[in-house]
């Protein structure tokens, strides 16, 4: 008997998942996509399997704007295990070396200013970055080490929250592309004892924080009680990750031409930059960019219903 193909639902919005430990970001995405029975899905940047916390998952039309969340700043809390280095710079890797730890709070706090602001980081071998089409982590698993170019990142906040024995808890706010594993490893190297990430929790991704997230257990319970439709109430609006952008409302006439790819003028438009755009009924219809001549050029459009 032929298997009946599951018909996916055309749903749009963002679910803010508190990613559980042990899941890759893609595995978490596919699990939630299955629960939501969504046709189209994408996440906004990977969290390591060891990490937990804020993972925005985009569905339907929201996937058109996932890149802008990927580019957003992030915040984390991490537990740094002093005295132990590993192959992956976190607790998932094999131990490379153990050293005695005699680090004081004063020593660690004196070191932190060197890692604030604009710094250069060498990405870890165990990362999703690619070399000649191959992810670095696959090369690392094969025992290969390749040269990686340092990358500029920004650490807006780096604060010691607690130091208990050989474990330090840090709060970090940083730009996209920052590797907390590399930050912790570099700190350990400077302290002379080595270190790795024992725990990592993302507390913020762009405008979203932990208070807005939902657990996988909650999603599974709601699905069990009311099916995929029971999860729809948890979907954030498609443009919720862009609420810090200026919002412009077009007249019916202008919205028609804008949705057909034509730049238009709008009252109260900023002089430059990206903007969210609504039609005359207040419906979000896409994002645009202010051109040099002051007109709003469409960049990504929402499919009309």
Curated annotation (Swiss-Prot):
Write the Enzyme Commission number(s) for this entry: 5.4.99.25
* Matches recorded under InterPro entries: PsdUridine_synth_cat_dom_sf (IPR020103), PsdUridine_synth_N (IPR002501), PUA-like_sf (IPR015947), PUA_sf (IPR036974), tRNA_psdUridine_synth_TruB (IPR014780), tRNA_sdUridine_synth_fam1_C (IPR015240), TruB_C (IPR032819)
GO MF, one example: tRNA pseudouridine(55) synthase activity
**Disulfide pattern:** none
- Which residues act catalytically here? 48
Task: Please state which protein family the record places this protein in.
Answer: Belongs to the pseudouridine synthase TruB family. Type 1 subfamily.
Function in brief: Responsible for synthesis of pseudouridine from uracil-55 in the psi GC loop of transfer RNAs.
Q: What is this protein called?
A: tRNA pseudouridine synthase B
Organism whose genome encodes this protein? Stutzerimonas stutzeri (strain A1501) (Pseudomonas stutzeri)
In the record, what lineage is assigned to the organism producing the protein? Answer: Bacteria, Pseudomonadati, Pseudomonadota, Gammaproteobacteria, Pseudomonadales
């Amino acid at each position: 008997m032929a298997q009946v193909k599951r018909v996916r639902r055309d749903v749009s919005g963002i679910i803010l998942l508190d990613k559980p430990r042990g899941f890759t970001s893609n595995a978490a995405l596919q699990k939630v996509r299955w629960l939501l029975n969504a046709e189209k899905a994408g996440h906004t940047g990977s969290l390591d399997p060891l990490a937990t916390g804020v993972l925005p998952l985009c569905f339907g039309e929201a996937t058109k704007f996932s890149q802008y969340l990927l580019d957003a700043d992030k915040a984390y809390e991490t537990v740094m295990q002093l005295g132990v280095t590993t192959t992956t710079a976190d607790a998932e890797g094999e131990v490379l070396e153990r050293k005695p730890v005699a680090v004081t709070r004063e020593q660690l706090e004196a070191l932190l200013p060197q890692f604030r602001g604009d710094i250069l980081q060498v990405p870890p071998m165990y990362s999703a970055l690619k070399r000649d089409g191959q992810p670095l982590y696959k090369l690392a698993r094969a025992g290969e080490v390749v040269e990686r170019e340092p990358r500029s990142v920004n650490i807006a906040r780096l604060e010691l929250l607690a130091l208990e024995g050989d474990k330090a808890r840090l709060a970090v706010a940083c730009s996209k592309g920052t590797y907390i594993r590399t930050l912790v490893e570099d700190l350990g190297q400077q302290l002379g004892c080595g270190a790795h990430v024992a725990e990592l929790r993302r507390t913020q991704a762009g405008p979203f924080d932990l208070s807005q997230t939902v657990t996988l257990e909650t999603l599974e319970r709601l699905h069990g009680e009311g099916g995929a439709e029971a999860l729809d109430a948890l979907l954030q609006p498609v443009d919720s990750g862009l609420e810090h952008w200026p919002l412009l409302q077009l007249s019916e006439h202008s919205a028609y031409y804008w949705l057909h790819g034509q730049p238009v003028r709008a009252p109260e438009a900023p002089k430059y930059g990206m903007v969210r755009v609504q039609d005359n009924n207040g419906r979000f219809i896409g994002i645009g960019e202010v051109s040099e001549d002051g007109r709003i050029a469409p960049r990504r459009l929402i499919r009309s219903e």
